[in-house]
């Protein structure tokens, strides 16, 4: 199948709008991606004609809604090549998935004197839950340091492991730098030291295929809204043997087997014991449509197009005076930069006046900002619906801002 960016763009209604009298150039998909009509229509159709509470309902609408929900679990398992759909838990997003692991597996397996390893490039969602766990139990948090080029100092990693290391939690792709970490060698090393591995895949799954069996990670988590799906829905993958051992994190309906005031409560089996309460069924339906959409386009086709676009963007940005780029030459999805000594917010505001949407701030990565000694960065992210013309507009906009601000 030949990838056609024009055909893809036609599926995204918002891309036809104007901002400040100019065509929208949406370069903020790493924060949240836009939604194709196929996703919008699937969720709307469910609410119009198929909505009902799932599980245990004997009537037709409930049974059909339950079947649709579980079919999305199956589709998601195929999307990341899990062994079984029952290794996947529906969560609100990457943040909740990581917190679930920290509060369920972490509380049961991390003790005083143990340690957890993260990296200096992590999103706060893959830092704060582990800080909280370490504070609760008296464990130590260890950090893989950064190199100036935005890669990790992996030569230091063997020295961070010891017999007390319980977990390595690491991002697949940095949300600021675009660095893709060499997970295969990292995971192998962690397992050699008896540690489990959690991978934050929020910035990876939309850019190329992910195979959790080939990676051999113990946990993998991602959000639907960055994958052209709805907000409020994500996937947590856990190896089946681990998932079966994990206690529930939240209590309520749907996750129980029996409830007795005198004899206590027993849990249903995984993954459903981690899905307390009424699920975001509409969001799940929308996620299924998003998975179907990108799978039909072909993730390898998407990857090839996006990499060509990234190479073009990096080459064109060389023409912008006083532009500082952060991250390695080989990267996925994002370009973080600052223009001279101007604050990122000012640069982003000027770009918005030109109809160009970028993200500004610390990007939920304050330790990374501290490493580069800056309060904020601008970040342009490139998705499958972005074009060479939009890159040209970004470059022209930055050149114009440089002339205006000096």
From Swiss-Prot:
Main location: cytoplasm
Subunit structure: Homodimer. Interacts with SufE and the SufBCD complex composed of SufB, SufC and SufD. The interaction with SufE is required to mediate the direct transfer of the sulfur atom from the S-sulfanylcysteine.
SUPFAM superfamilies linked to this entry: PLP-dependent transferases
Catalytic site: 364
Name of one Pfam family that matches: Aminotran_5
Name of the protein described by the UniProt record: Cysteine desulfurase
Gene Ontology biological process terms from the UniProt entry: cysteine metabolic process
Cited function: Cysteine desulfurases mobilize the sulfur from L-cysteine to yield L-alanine, an essential step in sulfur metabolism for biosynthesis of a variety of sulfur-containing biomolecules. Component of the suf operon, which is activated and required under specific conditions such as oxidative stress and iron limitation. Acts as a potent selenocysteine lyase in vitro, that mobilizes selenium from L-selenocysteine. Selenocysteine lyase activity is however unsure in vivo.
